[in-house]
């Protein structure tokens, strides 16, 4: 149980996928202009990333490894992620049309988020069990969501701030992301595995 808590804290704070491993930067910069859209993307990513981490583990352990075709893991994981995203979109559309309308384009965009594939591959590299893979996926998603929502709130504040003209837009956003990353570096000594 302690190991699962360490994995969770490590993936959320210490080894954050966006700020430390630089995975998922595209949605981090692209969807963080408004807090509402960032929250929708964070919710969808959390569900899909956790589920795809578990499904990728199962596909590797019970399909690829027994057949001796481990070299197909990347393409298999991409297909698993695409299937999870499509099933998630169909389930959300069927059960809650309002939520589907709110999430809109964000669900299909998760398929191209490199953090989702990164979690599947890093799970394999770290030789996590099924439960550890689920916690690792959830922690990575929670860390991604935390940083995305924080960054979106900061960007909304920057829109009304008196920023010099040359620094407006992407320039001040990248500087802000760097400062946010330095803030998360303070968690580096928190977990020792």
Swiss-Prot record:
Q: Does the keyword Ion transport apply?
A: no
Its GO CC terms are: plasma membrane
Top class in the EC scheme? translocase
Q: Does the keyword Electron transport apply?
A: yes
Q: Where in the cell is it found?
A: Cell inner membrane
* Topological type in the membrane: Multi-pass membrane protein
Which keywords does the record carry? Cell inner membrane, Cell membrane, Electron transport, Membrane, Translocase, Transmembrane, Transmembrane helix, Transport
What Enzyme Commission number(s) apply to this enzyme? 7.-.-.-
Output the GO biological process annotations, alphabetical, semicolon-separated.
electron transport chain
- Tell me which InterPro entries the record gives: Ion_transpt_RnfA/RsxA (IPR011293), NqrDE/RnfAE (IPR003667), NqrDE/RnfAE_oxidrdctase (IPR050133)
List where the protein spans the membrane.
Answer: 4-24, 38-58, 65-85, 102-122, 134-154, 171-191
The UniProt entry, under PANTHER family, shows: INTEGRAL MEMBRANE PROTEIN OF SOXR-REDUCING COMPLEX (PTHR30335), ION-TRANSLOCATING OXIDOREDUCTASE COMPLEX SUBUNIT A (PTHR30335:SF0)
Q: Which family does it belong to?
A: Belongs to the NqrDE/RnfAE family.
Quaternary structure annotation from Swiss-Prot or TrEMBL: The complex is composed of six subunits: RnfA, RnfB, RnfC, RnfD, RnfE and RnfG.
The protein's job, in short, is: Part of a membrane-bound complex that couples electron transfer with translocation of ions across the membrane.
Q: What is this protein called?
A: Ion-translocating oxidoreductase complex subunit A
